[in-house]
């Protein structure tokens, strides 16, 4: 597709300096997925779209979209920033990671189908106060397919049964029912609750989610499973993920200090 001026919906992912007065702004769009935009004079005092291109801003834009090169923004309307995400270190970290995952999973300039609405819904829910780790875990679970990993969550990969206890096997690429656990002594040894939530995460439409509460122990196990899959099967080493791990260590250390006091 040649460059064409059109209206589109976008989410500002990040931006970086370019020359003295200009910016490169990475945006997730509903038309061509992730795309890099050149914004001339964006650092100049009095620039009219300053608020429209702040990180974690979303809204309607008009510009020239290019599938194979830099795109351009002409104007913006009905934009607003996710203020709680922008100001809260934990929400900020998880949303930064979500956007980095999406940026890694999909090529620039290509439509990502329903993923735009799913990511937008994730950010809306985090902004509203739903657990940012759990919302991120849903995105992580569903994005595995985009990275070429397609775990079978809903049934035993050997016999197809789903009425028995299930556990995940990296070797077999999915769940094993208890009749076949002996096939993989290195399976993940999931408890029923963790297995259940992973099955739900794989298919849930975040646009229809209103609330979700999961106890801390199960949250830790869910994260351990997804970290294992991303480390071993996907092989990503994102800066945003490293920051989240470091942030969680800070929280654990603060908790220990509070207990000692």
Curated annotation (Swiss-Prot):
InterPro entries: ARFGAP/RecO, DNA_rep/recomb_RecO_N, NA-bd_OB-fold, RecO, RecO_C. It holds the Pfam family RecO_C. NCBIfam families: reco. GO terms for biological process: DNA recombination; double-strand break repair. One of its GO terms (cellular component) is bacterial nucleoid. Keywords: DNA damage, DNA recombination, DNA repair. The lineage of its organism: Bacteria, Bacillati, Bacillota, Bacilli, Lactobacillales. Belongs to the RecO family. It comes from Limosilactobacillus reuteri (strain DSM 20016) (Lactobacillus reuteri). This is DNA repair protein RecO. The keyword DNA repair applies.
């Amino acid at each position: 597709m040649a460059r064409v001026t059109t209206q589109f919906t976008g989410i500002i992912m990040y931006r970086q300096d370019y020359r003295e007065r200009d910016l490169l702004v990475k945006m997730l769009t509903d038309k061509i997925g992730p795309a890099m935009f050149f914004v001339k004079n964006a650092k100049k005092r009095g620039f009219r779209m300053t608020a429209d291109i702040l990180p974690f801003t979303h809204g309607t834009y008009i510009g020239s979209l290019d599938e194979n090169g830099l795109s351009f923004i002409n104007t913006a309307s009905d934009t607003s920033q996710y203020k709680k995400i922008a100001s809260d270190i934990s929400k900020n970290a998880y949303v930064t990671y979500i956007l980095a995952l999406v940026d890694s999973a999909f090529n620039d300039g290509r439509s990502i189908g329903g993923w735009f609405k799913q990511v937008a819904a994730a950010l809306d829910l985090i902004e509203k106060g739903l657990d940012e780790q759990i919302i991120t875990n849903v995105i992580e679970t569903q994005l595995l397919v985009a990275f070429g990993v397609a775990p079978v969550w809903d049934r035993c990969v050997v016999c197809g049964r789903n009425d028995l206890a299930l556990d995940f096997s990296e070797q077999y690429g999915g769940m094993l029912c208890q009749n076949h656990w002996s096939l993989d002594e290195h399976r993940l040894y999931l408890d029923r609750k963790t297995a259940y939530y992973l099955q739900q995460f794989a298919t849930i439409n975040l646009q229809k989610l209103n609330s979700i509460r999961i106890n801390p122990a199960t949250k830790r196990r869910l994260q351990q499973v997804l970290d294992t899959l991303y480390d071993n099967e996907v092989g990503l080493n994102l800066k945003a993920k490293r920051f989240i791990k470091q942030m969680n260590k800070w929280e654990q250390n603060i908790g220990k200090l509070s207990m000692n006091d």
